Structure formats: C-alpha cells, structure tokens
C-alpha cells in the first residue's frame, strides 16, 4: 500500500478523558485506503526540539468527508504538544503505515479486545468488517471509569462489555477476568486484541490453548515508520521483523511468545 505525505487540516480536537484526545484530520484530496490496525506518523512542528514524528493509531475514517480520526494519549512532550493544537491548524502526516488486521469472513463470530489506549482501532475494525452486530462482541478494559475512552460508537453492538480494575465501571478486573471472556471464549471464531503487552500475551495464550485464530496489534516503540531505524524490531518465528512495516498486527502464531 502506497505511503503518502499529506498536509492535513485539523477539524476537531476533543478531550476524551484526562490524558486521551481524539483528533480529526481532513484532506483536501481523496485519502488512500486505510485498514484497521494501521497508523499515521505525525510531525510535531511547534516543538523544534522534537525531531522524530510520532505514531498514532487510526480510530476511524469517513471517506465521504475525506477525514479520519486519531487517538492521542499523552505520554511525553510530543504527544502533549499535539493535544494543544486548535482546529484550523495544519498537520504534516505520513500515511497509511503498517499492516492492519485481517478481515473476518461473513460467517465469523469475532471478539474485539481493547485495553487502555489499545481500544483505538477496535471501532474502526468493528465497522469495517461488515458483520451483523450480533456477530461482534466488544470487551474494553481500563484501570477505572475515568480512564475509559468514549465508547458511544460501540453502542450499536449488542455484546459490549467493560472491565475496570477498581470495579467503577463494568466487571472488576482485567479483560481476561470478564465473565464473557472466561465462559464463552471458545464460541468465537476470531479474536483481535490491542493493549498492554501483558494483556495481549494473556489473550494470545488463551487463544492458543483454545486453538482459535488471534491477531494482536503490538505497541513497540517506533521512530522512523519505514523499517530503517530498527528500534521496533520484534522476534518472530521467521526471524526479526519491524513492527512499523511488517506489523503492527501479527498473528499470534508468528510470535515467539511463551505461555
């Protein structure tokens, strides 16, 4: 898929909770096709000391408006500066980057699991897969109610569940502690997950033991986005691979994780 450098217009900057923001960017020309799980590298112009672009996951797209949204979590100086941008400002991007999720077949029952800011690609995936809402189960986890990211778009899916570590929203615990996960995992044909490493490894372990198809979106540190700097390399069954170009989505059978 061809990568392009685009100067985009910021049309919306919405704070979703204390450290997560949704930025909506619009292009003057038609955007290239984007796949759930891909990301965008953004230049932080207002901070001259920040040399490298920052990668952000695509939350959703609106081809009719030539726009898409990014989830920006404040993790450092670059992301913090980006959240101060105002609608009307222009942002330099490189897009789309990486390999996204494999689309399910029409008969598949799928489980989408997002932890923390890993919820970013899940709504996009749920919408793009084109399945009946009854075939889609969404399970989102966070530390507390205040850490959960806006879930309005998920309401169309009947099987939509929360977990929080302090029981302030949904069931208490991690996503792997949820009653649906523990009792109905084997009913799904495909599992897709994005979130903290320990969460994804736990999901991968359970999917492996159940013999289920499972893809995870890794969150390795990235710099260039083109597989040149090698800072995001992940060991796989077929050698080292750059997460920014050969991921960030991998089938769990490609990874060398030990359960």
List where the protein language model places each region.
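FNR/FR-type flavoprotein reductase catalytic core
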Residues: 77-219
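Ferredoxin-reductase
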Residues: 2-87
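Short, Lys/Arg- and Gly-enriched loop/turn segments at beta-strand edges
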Residues: 48-56, 98-106, 244
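Local cysteine-cluster metal-coordination motifs and their immediate loop/turn environment
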Residues: 121, 197-198, 219-248
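Structural signal for conserved beta-strand scaffold positions within catalytic alpha/beta enzyme cores
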Residues: 12, 60, 162-164, 216, ...
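Short, basic/aromatic-enriched C-terminal tail that caps enzymatic domains
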Residues: 1-4, 240-259
């Amino acid at each position: 898929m061809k990568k392009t450098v685009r100067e985009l217009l910021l049309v919306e900057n919405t704070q979703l909770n204390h450290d997560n923001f949704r930025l909506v960017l619009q292009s003057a020309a038609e955007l290239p096709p984007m796949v759930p799980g891909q990301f965008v590298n953004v230049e932080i112009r207002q901070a001259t000391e920040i040399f490298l672009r920052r990668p952000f996951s695509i939350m959703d797209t609106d081809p009719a408006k030539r726009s898409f949204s990014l989830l920006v979590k404040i993790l450092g100086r670059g992301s913090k500066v980006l959240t101060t941008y105002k609608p009307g400002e222009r942002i330099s991007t490189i897009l789309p980057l990486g390999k996204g999720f494999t689309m399910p077949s029409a008969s598949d029952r799928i489980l989408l699991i997002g932890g923390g800011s890993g919820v970013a690609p899940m709504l996009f995936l749920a919408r793009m897969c084109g399945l009946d809402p009854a075939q889609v189960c969404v399970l989102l986890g966070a530390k507390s109610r205040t850490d959960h990211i806006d879930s309005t778009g998920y309401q169309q899916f009947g099987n939509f569940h929360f977990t929080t570590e302090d029981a302030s929203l949904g069931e208490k615990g991690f996503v792997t502690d949820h009653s649906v996960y523990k009792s109905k995992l084997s009913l799904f044909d495909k599992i897709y997950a994005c979130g903290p490493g320990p969460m994804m490894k736990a999901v991968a372990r359970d999917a492996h033991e159940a013999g289920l198809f499972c893809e995870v979106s890794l969150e390795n540190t990235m710099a260039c986005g083109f597989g040149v700097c090698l800072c995001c390399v992940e060991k796989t069954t077929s050698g080292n691979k750059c997460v920014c170009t050969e991921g960030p989505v991998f089938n769990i059978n490609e990874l060398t994780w030990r359960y």
